[in-house]
UniProtKB/Swiss-Prot annotation:
This is WD repeat-containing protein WRAP73. PANTHER family: WD REPEAT PROTEIN 8-RELATED (PTHR16220), WD REPEAT-CONTAINING PROTEIN WRAP73 (PTHR16220:SF0). InterPro entries: Centrosome-WD_assoc, Quino_amine_DH_bsu, WD40/YVTN_repeat-like_dom_sf, WD40_rpt. The modification Phosphoserine is found at residue 281. The keyword 4Fe-4S does not apply. Interacts with SSX2IP. One of its GO terms (biological process) is mitotic spindle assembly. It comes from the Eukaryota. It is found in: Cytoplasm; Cytoplasm, Cytoskeleton, Microtubule organizing center, Centrosome. GO terms for cellular component: centrosome; ciliary basal body; cytoplasm. Coiled coil: none annotated. It comes from Mus musculus (Mouse). The SSX2IP:WRAP73 complex is proposed to act as regulator of spindle anchoring at the mitotic centrosome. Required for the centrosomal localization of SSX2IP and normal mitotic bipolar spindle morphology. Required for the targeting of centriole satellite proteins to centrosomes such as of PCM1, SSX2IP, CEP290 and PIBF1/CEP90. Required for ciliogenesis and involved in the removal of the CEP97:CCP110 complex from the mother centriole. Ubiquitous.
Length: 462
């Protein structure tokens, strides 16, 4: 495993292009485009204000920069650096901006969610979509880019509208039996739309493309309900994370629950492997010390290293007692993610914040638990294989695969708190994001990890 040098960064704004050739990063009002293989700067663009959001077009030919405070979006072209587009929403304001799947239209959501404006880069035409709902996840495209589903609120009722992305014509419009619709998401195959209600009302609704209600699911009543939702890449499973600390798995045939995964504070099953992060001190002989120390060694000396150890059961995990009289209590399953092959599901229970639970979806049982010394901030699966990257806000990155897990210190002068991460399309590298800097972590090839993956039913190794 190797690391690049660190580069300046603002607002954790660092994104790989969809084709994997470029890396975009922001420094205040400047947009920097680098070649992924050499990390040499290819283009440097200057925006009119500090950038708050960036997004690549699906074909990697354009990139948009949103400046919400100014109500501005600027679009840059990689093929024609002298060309650029400026979209000014004026007094309507701007709270969100995204590409359409064709990479030639931009959807801007105005302040107070009064409307969505669809701007065409080719024809310069403008279309308007009324009544978008201000909710957690109110806009979703099918993977093939043909349809847009939009959550709406009008006349004190929730609705969903489905638009054809080729001409933005309304295809279907139907109301949802929800008190306060919180989110919608298409299944990866684009055949089913999941819609879920506010946390005060446990309800998941599943609709077909033509707006027919396929199924409604409610696990319990009179308590805080849904906190997170995730589709498996195969579209066979819908995972629902709840405030009661459980993940419920619905199947795609009957849309009934096939199992539920609990997140207890104590692991009693002796067959469950629990890795605990533990500190280790670097052993440096006097004969090997140099002054001044090399850059990589200086970073290692400034921060203690750590390793994973297999804990013997029963294992008690660190827990938080949620504050019951405040909104958004730190409890329940707040993070869910399936591996790219749909074999594994990773989850975090927010009142056991230091632990990541990894479930074997084929066998519908707990596979491993990873407990860290600090609360888990983020985790993300390798796009090509079952390998999970985790960060906790410290100067380490953690990697797990079915063959085992490792804690890696990020080298460098001073501290490098890893606040976020994102995988390259190939899975060969990983961008580690800090408050003011980012660097790339280069990993071993898929073939070597794949060999270890074939042994996944055996005892994991550290």
């Amino acid at each position: 495993m190797n690391f690049s040098e660190s580069f300046k960064l603002s607002g954790l704004l660092c994104r790989f292009s969809p084709d994997g050739k470029y890396l975009a990063s922001c420094v205040q009002y400047r947009l920097v485009i680098r070649d992924v293989t050499t990390l040499q700067i290819l283009q440097l663009y200057t925006c009119l204000d500090q950038i708050q959001h960036i997004e690549w077009s699906a074909d990697s030919l354009f990139i948009l920069c949103a400046m919400y405070r100014r109500g501005l979006v600027q679009v840059w072209s990689l093929e024609q650096p002298e060309w650029h587009c400026k979209i000014d929403e004026g007094s309507a304001g701007l709270v969100a901006s995204c590409w359409s799947p064709d990479g030639r239209h931009i959807l801007n959501t105005t302040e107070f969610h009064l409307r969505i404006t669809v701007w065409s880069l080719c024809t310069k035409s403008v279309s308007y979509i009324k009544y978008p709902k201000a909710c957690q996840q109110g806009l979703t495209f099918t993977r093939d880019g043909r349809y847009l589903a939009l959550a709406e609120r009008r006349d004190c009722r929730d609705y969903v509208s489905i638009f054809v992305c080729s001409d933005w014509q309304l295809l279907r419009h139907f109301d949802t039996d929800t008190q306060d619709l919180t989110g919608i998401e298409w299944a990866p195959n684009g055949c089913v739309l999941a819609a879920w209600d506010t946390c005060l009302e446990y309800k998941v609704l599943l609709y077909s493309l033509d707006g027919r209600l396929l199924s409604a699911y409610c696990a319990y009543e009179w308590s805080l309900g849904i906190k997170s939702v995730a589709w498996s890449p195969s579209s066979q499973f819908l995972a629902i994370g709840s405030y009661d600390g459980k993940v419920r798995l619905l199947n795609h045939v009957t849309w009934k629950m096939i199992t539920e995964f609990g997140h207890p504070a104590t692991i009693n099953n002796p067959k469950t492997v629990v890795y605990k992060e533990a500190e280790k001190s670097p052993l440096l002989g006097l004969g090997h010390l140099s002054f001044p120390p090399p850059r990589a060694m200086a970073g290692a000396l400034s921060t203690s290293e750590s390793k994973y150890e297999i804990a013997s059961g029963p294992v008690s995990l660190q827990t938080l007692k949620p504050v019951a009289d405040r909104a958004n209590p730190r409890m329940g399953v707040g993070m869910l993610a399936f591996s790219s092959d749909s074999y594994f599901l990773a989850s975090r229970n927010d009142n056991v914040p230091n632990a990541v639970w990894i479930w074997d979806i084929q066998k519908l049982k707990l596979f491993v638990v990873l407990e860290h010394m600090s609360p888990v901030r983020s985790f993300q699966w390798d796009p090509q294989q079952p390998r999970l990257a985790i960060c906790t806000g410290g100067s380490k990155v953690y990697l797990w695969s079915p063959a085992g897990c490792v804690s890696v210190q990020v080298p460098g002068e001073g501290d490098f708190p890893v606040l976020g991460l994102c995988w390259h399309l190939s899975g060969d590298s990983l961008a580690l994001l800090s408050k003011d800097h980012f660097c790339l972590c280069f990993l071993e090839t898929k073939e070597r990890v794949g060999t270890a993956y074939e042994q996944r039913d055996g005892m994991p190794r550290t």
